[in-house]
Amino acid sequence: MKRRRIDVLCLQETRWMGCKAKEIGERIKLFYYGVETKTNGVAIAVAGTLKEHVLSVNRVSERLISVRIATNEGFWTVISVYAPQCGCPEADEMAFYDELDEAIKSTPESDYLLLLVTRDFNGHVGQDRKGFERVHGGRGFGIRNQDGERIVDMAEAQDLAIASTFFMKRKSQKVTYCSGGQKSEIDHILVRRNDLKTIKDVKDVKSIPGEVAGQHRPVVADMCIALPKKTKTNVEPRIRWWKMTKESQKILREKIVETGLPDPSGPIDSVWASAANITLKCARDTLGETVGGRRGDMAAWFWNENLQQVVKAKKNAYKIWQDTKSLAALNDYKSKKKAAKAAVAKAKNAALDEIYKKLDTSQAEKFVFLLAKARHRNSLDVTEVRTVKSGNGIVLKDPTEVKERWKQYFSHLLNQEFPRKERISARPVVGPVQPRSVEEVRKVMKKMKIGKAVGPDGVPVEAWKVLGESGLLWLTTFFNNITRSERIPDAWRDSVIVPVFKRKGDIMDCANYRGIKLTAHTMKVYERLLDSRLRDMVEIAADQFGFTPERSTIDAIFIARQVMEKYREKNKPCHIAFLDLEKAYDKLPRTLLWEVLRERGIPEYMVRTIQDMYGGSTTRVRTVHGTTSKFEIGVHQGSALSPFLFILTLDTVVKNLMEGPPFTLLYADDGALIANSKVELQDKIREWQMTLADAELRLNLKKTEIMSSIEEPGDVSDISGTMFTQTKEFQYLGSLLSADGTVGAAVRGRITCAWLKWRESTGILCDRRCSRVLKGKVYRTIVRPALLYGSECWPVSKTHERMLNTAEMRMLRWACGFTRCDRVRNEDIRTMMQTVPIQLKLLEQRLRWYGHVMRRPSHHLTRRALEMEVPGKRSRGAPKKRWTDAIYKDMKEVGVTTDDIQDRALWRSRTRTADPANMRDKR
């Protein structure tokens, strides 16, 4: 592509397996699709100047793939086609042409150009253009055959021009296939007839073996369309905090101490500005900073000048052989080809040896996961989008308009508030200011993670950790100064929003992006101090599991499954409404927040401090075209304090509606209401709807769904009469619940999720140079937790265990490079990967969770759900397997009783039979 200056290259019969993207060097990105049989296969390679403008990739089949690219004047759709060969069943040919017709018809008419590249169409369109003058130029090659008639008919029906027939060329520039003395033109380029004027030339060119199959010659088209201009993105230099070592930490600490931080008791704004400047200056001098701009091509890092000369000599030898056809030239080409191949392999292996040696060390664990993440990112079709849609659906391409659209979207999202009913304001609680202690700050600093993106001030938490005790003393005094003054530095009010695509929906729609907000790290430390104080002063209802210590998603999932299981056991109807609040975090009214804080008895000085933190907040949106201008926001979304303030507000608003577990379950803004009948459930939903509306919050009617274990007549509707969606399965907090209470759907869902995680990690798991021990570590840390999420709540059967074991063994065999035809035993595979059978891991997780539940007090919500009784009798016949049945069987297998539960060390030693995957398992 580089030699011919090709921007888009369509490939067929690639015979690669999988469907993803791949960086192949020289900033070229390859989008491909292939099946497990490694037959057929299509791909499209896009040059570096265009890959950033790819909007979507549509992989129809192993014979059809399309890419849509944004241009200056519109959009360009490229379709790569590999038609069925002679002898293929007629049904396959008909299915192929149906898919091709649908792909062409689905391309928007407004697209600037549709380029259809085909290979092995086996159709000779010939020179005769009679009856097809609009789509055939009369300058083809050979005589039209039956397959050629089909091509011309399709071109006529779709108004596509066969581009090569409109250009007068030599015979040698028309022939695209040559074998056994037979020459023909079977590869064609088709464009919309109205866009034929953009095609300036079409011809075939000589290829070099290794680039194209020997019998085929590539077809090249010169087109005149306005491609996107190369835009220069201003990238701000960054301090190399990630390069910090123990030695550089010592140097940085000495420089800051020598320079001296300002007195933390002085004016807040000037103190912080001075402290930030001193810290950043010392860090630049010690660690250095990046220069910004685009990184170079990292794929060909082993390519040196010597290799370039060897490969160039091989190409020259091939050209000489093609011109002379002499035996001496052929032998010379073969020897140079062999030498070039050996030289490339030697250079690449030598360069890779050091990297893989580093991967096998115990210190390289973080590097392994960074490498897997980077390789996964390179396999994504679209990594950045330069065009978005306006509120009216108009596509915006101008950088200024794109930035303005992002600003408009987030400004509306973070400032919109619904009308609400005023609450009776509580009297302010007056009390003395409680200063922060050094121990409180130290405890919070331990929870702060390093390596996170910094806010606009550029000061990360690493800077304070480097200073050690002196940094803690300075921060404690400064935070107490903020508390007394009841205001934060103005520099902390600014933030940056980074839009992240949710991987679903239209990629050009701003609503399909989640805004990640970057704020000052030091402010997050102060917010965590406030958060800990607030949690000590108020108590959150037992129904709320989100952002609360010692409560998790597994608690809520376990309670929901236990309730459904017990209702099923007694053959009683169980109706669940899964509630979702509409943009709850983004539209939380600030005035409601102050009223709630005073109502819950929070001291007024803390209320005023939080008010100041939320007042005058501004933000900017970071886009691929640069950062937008500042705009004010009403909701201080994304801070460390916001989650607790949200659940505190929701807890106060709906406190009179809480029935307690297991009939009301909340995880932040996701709720579940359980009732015995649809009428009762409808009354509950409407009551919640009215209460939330009074607090300026709304239910998302599209995402609120109803699930019933036993079908009953009638529907459930809201206040306005809108019917809620009835469902048989619902994804609750990541675990799939079924109306019949079984876990089969959940098992299948986790297997699907595990395969997604597997594909994200194939950069390591499918790398032949990585050791199997390293692959096993990656599998146990990334893939298996996704496979077994929520499994501690499953009463799995032998069938479910076989499903999980089959999925796991396929992954492990694939990682080892074996198939079942190699006849390698499962036990040997697990030994290589240091991974125990998944049945043991399931047993361990169930018993670990059972011990955790039973050690809790009897009034705890999980204990109450486990021990609750539903009135009625069990149905006749074989009873369904219960979770406790699986537990008693597990206990018998490992040799423990209920008397051993309170002895945590004994219980752990007896039940831990599987390999540890994470820190929780190792404890």
Predicted regions and their residues:
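A shared catalytic/ligand-binding motif for oxyanion handling
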Residues: M1-A342, N349, D353, K357, ...
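Surface-exposed loop/turn segments and immediately adjacent short secondary-structure elements
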Residues: L9, P228, K232, M244, ...
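Catalytic palm active-site di-aspartate
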Residues: Y82, H216, G455, D494-I497, ...
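Basic, alpha-helical interaction scaffolds
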Residues: R240-R284, Q309, N316, G721-W794, ...
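Short, conserved micro-motifs composed of acidic
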Residues: C19-I28, F167-S184, G431, L697-K728, ...
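Catalytic palm subdomain of template-directed nucleic-acid polymerases
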Residues: C88-A91, G126-R144, K583-R600, G671-A695, ...
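Active-site palm subdomain of RNA-directed nucleic acid polymerases
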Residues: T107-L115, L530-F545, P643-I674
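Conserved pre-catalytic core of RNA-dependent polymerases
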Residues: Y82, F410, R427-F644
